[in-house]
Amino acid sequence: MNGILLIIASLFLPSAVFAGENSGVGATSPLDLTHHIVGYLSILFTVLAYVAAMSEEVIELRKSKPMVLGSAIIWFAICIYYALNGQAKVAALAFESNLLAYIELLLFILVSMTYLNAMEERGIFDGLRIWLLNKQFSYRQLFWITGFLAFVLSTVVSGLAVGLLMGAVATAVGKNKTKFIGIACVNIVVAVNAGGTFSPLGGISTLFVWQHKILKFGEFFALALPCLVNFLVPAIIMHFFVPKDTPAASSRAINLRRGSKRILLLFAVTLVITVWGNVYLELPPAAGMMAGLALLQFFSFYLTQTVKNQESQFAYAYKFFGVDVPVGNEKQDFDIYKNVGNVEWDTLLFFYGAMMIIGALSFVGYLDAIAQFLYGQNHPTNANIIIGLSSAFIDNGTLMFAVLNMHPDLPPGQWLLLTLTLGVGGSLLAIGSAPGVGLLGQIKEGYTFGYHMRWMPVILLGYIASIATHFWINAEYF
């Protein structure tokens, strides 16, 4: 077996053949490969994978594909080298550790997305859009309503889903007002990122910190006021640039499908179980979410078994004239597995690739070197602010997972600061967060990368104000 591995290694890892077998490293100690061909190849494939993922719209290649392939190449290279040095088990255990962290994230997000798909399928989000239109709010009122709804909903719902929902509302009410669409979408992106930052149930980077048991669930709420400031400062300034007139009302009626309100209740119960299980039973968050998925599965069974065919007595006439059965008269089945299948698998697989790549770089030794540079030679506050600014163009979940793998020795106040800056820093650029990227793809006119850039100074002002607020009200955490 070693001979076969040696041949394979010689094909794409030439220096592995000449690695000394008597390296003096214990059987359980990771090898320092930062100055080895394996380390250099890890950096190369990391850069290639991320460049390809960031160029998704240009090269028309889904972002998950290069990330998953890059992570596979890097880990196979590492494992082959370790096997040649008689330490295959060390590399395998490191891989399994990173895989476990991903599986917990996967199950958590999978359940959350499944509930969101179920709500959308039952007409809840469409009903919200119609309700807002029928209330005849002015553009300025809608600017604040969509912003606050985005802020609140993002504490418990995926930021991408909330961003797309509120973006759809802004587009629907501002058909002939591209100026309103653009400024409302900027406000929505800022609100979503701010709202998801102080809740592990809504933000990926915050969820990572919670999963690693660095901070307790309740401690994140210390960021509620700083996050609110981050949202309000740019929103107040943008308010004066929003049109004052009122859009036309919608002629559509709200049609919620059977079971919609009960699904909302089940989602709330799921979140309560998740938090309670983590706080009092010390279970991982994924355990509570999977319990909630089981509830939704049984409710799906109940809806399917108790559904009544509501076709009217004139059904034969509809069929004869080739007319569709009116909404509300058709049989309303509910298939839970369709909702599971419709989750954002590209996003979930992207996170697999990102987390495994970051885990590999940590195992090779690069993240320790970066941690020494960031936190050893700089004050933690400066390091955390810089990392937060970098989230304007790098996914905040990936950055947080990288910092967690650096294992910096930080007080709770600095961990809260890092959570804050990474969460809200993505608002600075349209490509810095999932809601921004999602709206760029959804909105055809009014909201562009350049338009978002125009408001970056006021968003940066909110970023600075939120940091100052954190130091002011959370001094006891430092």
Regions found by a protein language model. Give the residues of each.
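N-terminal secretory/membrane targeting signals
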Residues: M1-E21
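Membrane-core helix-loop-helix motifs of multi-pass transport proteins
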Residues: N2, A9, N176-L265, V272-Y280, ...
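Hydrophobic core segments of alpha-helical transmembrane domains in multi-pass membrane transport
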Residues: A9-P14, S42-S55, G70-I80, I109-N117, ...
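Structural signature of hydrophobic alpha-helical transmembrane segments
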Residues: L31-F45, L100-V111, S154-G163, L223-P234, ...
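Hydrophobic transmembrane alpha-helices of multi-pass solute/ion transporters
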Residues: I43-T114, G127-K135, A286, M290-M356, ...
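Membrane-embedded alpha-helical segments and adjacent helix-loop junctions characteristic
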Residues: Q87-K179, G341-D409
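Re-entrant/interfacial helical elements at transmembrane boundaries that shape
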Residues: A161-A172, C185-V186, S199-K213, L295, ...
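C-terminal transmembrane helix pair
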Residues: F221-V229, L349, N382-F478
